[in-house]
Amino acid sequence: MSIASVKTPSSLREAQIQSLEKLLNLNQDVNELESSPQHASNFPIWKVLIFDKAGSETISSVLRISDLRKHGVTVHMNITSFRQPIADVPAIYFVQPTQENIELIIEDLSKGLYESAYVCFSSTISRALLEQFAELASKTNTSHMIHQVYDQYLNYVVLESDFFSLQLPKIFHTFHNPSSDEALINSRVQDIVNGLFSVIVTLGTIPIIRCPQGSAAEMVAQKLNQRLKDHLMNTKDAFVSVNPKPRPILILLDRTVDLIPMINHSWTYQALIHDTLNMQLNRITVESVDDGKMTKRFYDLDGNDFFWESNASKPFPKVAENIDEELTRYKNDASEITRKSGVSSLEEVNVDAFADSTYLKSAVSLLPELTARKQILDMHMNIATALLKAIQERHLDDFFQLEDNITGLNRSAILACINNKEQGTPEDKLRFFIIWYLSVDSVPASDLQAYEEALVNNGCTLEALNFVKRVREITKMTMLASSTTRPATGQTGDNLFRGFSSLSTRFTDRFKEAGIGGLENIISGVRNLIPFRKDGTITSIVQSLMDPGSSPASKQTESYLLLDPKSARAITVNNDPRAMNKRQTFSEAIVCVLGGGNYLEYGNLADWAREQNPKKRIIYGSTDILSPSEFMEEMASLS
């Protein structure tokens, strides 16, 4: 078995794309293939790509069909689907190492579906399963058709530049369910270790590991540390060679360290989308009613979306303003081209007609870029329209304002929110109350009873709250939310919400068509609100571990376990005098939360990292990325 060597690019997404491109070129370096005279004439080799569900999720999150074609993939199919023979081309199998998958591969080869097979397992195949694979190939006389078997270490999904998911559902439920037996917990811990090991291989450097003691995070940390030690001892792969870059810190945390970000009503673009629309693996589903029929539109986000790249983490009113500005810029650029070419619209522009005019040809050459820009802006206009409708229907601006000043609310304000028939869904109200309940020091029993009665009377079921009541004291002890707040994106007051006004003015007809009225009323409720970025608990923990000397939270993380896969033993900072030298600063961190992650936390960490001087890099991920509704459902299942 072998690990495909990779360089260390500027982001996890770029690193994973490099690894996938190498996989698509039969585990040969793409740059070498393109530059070598010996191979250039035959590049790319045409081939078939076969994947399972996990492989499909990994690829589709970072590559498009055009990217697959660029690397010679003419056909891509699921391994469980019916497939016709394509006997004269090789097949790449990108699948999980399971009994079912190896049997399906052997079945394909026995039928002669493809010329040869390049088998790329997304994670490490066990020795027992590998031996069984070899035995099946021998029995069916297909061994000669298997040209490669690789452990690719790609069993995770990248959603943003430095944002990943291990795609392991229900981890929170498993770790907090009293009926989960030891075998199940150990199995899930091993799944997490396998996924994190793959992320580390892709990044090409061995981290120093920190985690709280006596937790599920420690179980993962210990097993991952041993896995890395064994790998360092037994292999000489490129990713463990001398690396001039400083080693990162890997911070492992349990979800119970802070439950609030999972259910917050956020005001940032990407978090609002994840909360109010169906967003899975960078595909957004927008439902609308056209001619009395419910229709669905799908929008795919990718790394080439310039608007998403620069606006995803911004407050939604600022995003609305930026849509307006970008559309104005597009119209000005389009008008310039039509003016120079003497036509009334871009559709009338004939590129061939200007072949002899360098001046006009230069202007017309911008046409493809303009068309792509317009498609992206139209997509975000439609998404913004759907968000505005959700904000109006659920009064999300009210919840955002209440939660922004959650500890300042009194009993009457809380009951008023719960009892307001026009404000939010029952789940919105329960989320709001749980956030308040986790934010205050104590709640009198009589008050709690009154709140619960009000919640039930307004359609709420209390299963999620019952679970939170059990873990409240643990969560309260670990919450380190900083009292320091900073203006979000440098915008304040009316200036921030000017985007709503311009959007309302410019696209009134579009909103009316979508059934959205009274946009000004939505704006007026938040016009005087100054959104501040508060360093959440996990951001405070990360700061204390990356830069111990500058964080007031450092004392609360001193007891965290410190594991160095390159060292012989584990130590904690506060119980070993020699560990004092380990209080080093880090420029890069990998942060993984066990039991669910979210876009709000990712954005908060990214904002903090950008503000540092010099800037820091943080890669954030989780066992699974959950919307507030999904996490509420998981908590309810534990009541």
From Swiss-Prot:
Subcellular compartments: Cytoplasm
Keywords: Cytoplasm
Principal localisation: cytoplasm
GO biological process terms held by the UniProt record: endoplasmic reticulum to Golgi vesicle-mediated transport; intracellular protein transport; retrograde vesicle-mediated transport, Golgi to endoplasmic reticulum; vesicle docking involved in exocytosis
Family, per entry: Belongs to the STXBP/unc-18/SEC1 family.
Gene: sly1
Protein name per the record: Protein sly1
UniProt source species: Schizosaccharomyces pombe (strain 972 / ATCC 24843)
Gene Ontology MF terms: syntaxin binding
GO cellular component: cytosol; Golgi membrane
Gene3D superfamilies: 1.25.40.60, 3.40.50.1910, 3.40.50.2060, Syntaxin Binding Protein 1, Chain A, domain 2
